[in-house]
Every structure is written in C-alpha cells, then in structure tokens.
Amino acid sequence: MKLTCMMIVAVLFLTAWTFVTAITSNGLENLFPKAHHEMKNPEASKLNKRCVPYEGPCNWLTQNCCDATCVVFWCL
C-alpha cells in the first residue's frame, strides 16, 4: 500500500514537472545558441559583466542594473 502511494505521488510530481518545463521551454530553446555565441566571443558573455544591485547608481546608457531598470541614474 505504501509503495503504491509513493508511486502515485512520484507520477503526479513528474507529470507536474513536465507541464512546468513545457511552459518555460522557450527559455530553454534559446539557451544553447547564446552559449555557443558566448563560446565564440567570450567578451559577449554576461558572466564577465558586472551589474549594479537594486537602488544602486547606474549608467543609463549601458543599462547595467542586475534585475531592475536604470531610472535617473538609479536602479529601480
């Protein structure tokens, strides 16, 4: 009985995981071309660039904020 319940939970979890990854598959499709481009041109890699955290001073020309938008020289 316990094994049957564990199998049912595992199948439900894997089914949910499949649906979640299917929704975000567009992000995965673009992963490899970007990585290939970065291998050809290491300077284009985002790992080499430093970003400014939220509410830090930024450059509005280069938009160097990590997860925000540069507004009036501040990452917001």
Curated annotation (Swiss-Prot):
Signal peptide: 1-22
Cystines in this chain: 51-66, 58-70, 65-75
Keyword list, A-Z: Calcium channel impairing toxin, Cleavage on pair of basic residues, Disulfide bond, Ion channel impairing toxin, Knottin, Neurotoxin, Presynaptic neurotoxin, Secreted, Signal, Toxin, Voltage-gated calcium channel impairing toxin
Localization (cell): Secreted
Propeptide residue intervals: 23-48
UniProt GO molecular function: calcium channel regulator activity; ion channel inhibitor activity; toxin activity
Tissue specificity note: Expressed by the venom duct.
Domain of life of the source: Eukaryota
Coiled coil feature spans: none
Pfam family, one: Conotoxin
GO cellular component, one term: host cell presynaptic membrane
Primary role: Omega-conotoxins act at presynaptic membranes, they bind and block voltage-gated calcium channels (Cav).
Notes concerning its domains: The presence of a 'disulfide through disulfide knot' structurally defines this protein as a knottin.
Family, per entry: Belongs to the conotoxin O1 superfamily.
Stated name of the protein: Omega-conotoxin-like TxO5
